[in-house]
Amino acid sequence: MKKYILKRFLQLIPVLIGITFLSFAMMRIAGSDAITELYGDKGAVAQEIIDAKRAELGLDQPFLTQYLAWVGGILTGDMGISYISGRDVFQTFVSKLPATLLLTVLAICATVMISIPLGVLAAVRHDKFTDYFLRFFSFIGNSLPNFFVALLLMQVFSIHWSIFPVISNGTTVQSAVLPTLTLAVAMSAKYMRQVRATVLEELNKDYVEGAKARGVRGRVILWKSVLKSSMLTIITLLALSIGSLLGGTAIIESIFMWDGVGKLAVDAITMRDYPLIQAYVVWMAIIYVMVNLITDLLYHALDPRIRLGVSEA
């Protein structure tokens, strides 16, 4: 186990190098930088001032020199200074994490509470009205884009009924209701279909028939055996969703002005704020590697027959 965990952490190094290098290259290929976005290119500011500012930030250096300087800063705990705000990148990024963490926890909780019971119900009521109705709901939820759901909820609950604020501050549960519902609609629809399919597959297995023959109640079989066997699929979905949510949901955060990591990333990309963009890239890489590692460990805990690829230490 220890060797496996160490191996996965070591795998993070080439992943980070590859991802950061590619993102650095793509931003340069884009053809403009933060100075162009800040001062414009219409001649409003003297070219000498623009060149001096670009030299001050090191943007006049060769690409490889800039990249190595940034990597060296990371290794010493310095992620640089934001080109636009002038604030420390690490502090700026960390200040946005609480809002993203709050939205992640609420969205996952809402999704689990909606999708698992409904998915199980649809499987138990297979090919009956309840099943058809829930499958229709799932189809609609999967078909609607997040931005449309967000605007619809905002129109109804914020503008028409004035129950929730139009603009969220990213710190209170009340302001998180609409962003959470928006995310939960699509996620619940997807989860419900997967839970239904997995539970339905388990219900048709021989051990379920054997338990029924021994007189075990259907509800006990469902919640203690079938659902436990279905947990691997649910954990996989949760892992993917947690990774994307912790990376910030750019569209939803931008619509609701939710002051989280996703909105920060959009603003940084728009303004070509390289240090902030690179901080976001590193964060996403770390999140997905860690989520995948935790998922593998949970797989092994739930089903010891699953091997982790190395001998146990």
Stretches found by the model and what they are:
Residues L6-R8, I13, L153:
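Hydrophobic alpha-helical segments of polytopic membrane proteins
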Residues L22-I29, G58, G72, F136-P165, ...:
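Membrane-water interface segments at the C-terminal ends of transmembrane alpha-helices
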Residues I17-F21, V105-C109, F148-Q155, V282:
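Hydrophobic alpha-helical transmembrane segments of multi-pass integral membrane proteins
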Residues G43, L151-I163, S254-G262:
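Peri-membrane helix termini and adjoining interfacial loops of integral membrane proteins
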Residues L16-T65, S162-L178:
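Hydrophobic alpha-helical transmembrane segments of membrane transport/permease proteins
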Residues K2-K3, F93, L97-T130, N146, ...:
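Alpha-helical transmembrane segments of integral membrane proteins
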Residues L59-I116:
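An internal, D/E-rich "acidic patch" concept
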